[in-house]
Design a protein with these regions (language model features):
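Sec-dependent N-terminal signal peptides
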Residues: 5-15
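N-terminal secretory signal peptides that target proteins for export/translocation
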Residues: 1-2
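A "functional boundary" signal
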Residues: 18-129
């Protein structure tokens, strides 16, 4: 009887552990989706206000590739460009573009938070595995 109850208890623990892991993975995917949406809108905005070309690609394509390989340099580069544009708009007293720049600063802040959270969740999941 004890052996049978022990195996049922073990099975319940295993199912609970698998369920928790699935929930963590679902949450991680949801946060990554949110982060991707943030980054897509940021890249679209950057491409609209900074219409430069890089190696035959538009800014959106170039930075999307850069982001997928290493997100932190993307955030740093975007923040630097946005700061320069912000200073330019402040000097020219262009309030419409300044308002948009402040909005994109906020988006970068949110993205950075989402990236940090997804990264820490990934580390937790890797420790459990």
């Amino acid at each position: 009887m004890k052996l049978q109850s022990l195996s049922i208890f073990s099975l319940l623990l295993l199912l609970t552990a698998c369920s928790v892991r699935e929930n963590d993975l679902w949450l991680q995917k949801a946060e990554q989706f949110y982060a991707d949406k943030q980054i897509d809108s940021t890249l679209t905005y950057l491409n609209r206000i900074i219409p430069e070309k890089l190696e035959g690609e538009d800014v959106y394509t170039y930075w999307r590739i850069q982001f997928s390989t290493s997100p932190q340099p993307f955030i740093r580069h975007s923040a630097e460009k946005i700061e320069k544009l912000s200073q330019h708009y402040e000097k020219t007293k262009d309030t419409i573009n300044l308002k948009e720049i402040n909005h994109i600063r906020y988006r970068l802040f949110l993205y950075n938070q989402a990236y940090d959270k997804a990264d820490s969740m990934l580390q937790i999941i890797e420790k459990r595995a």
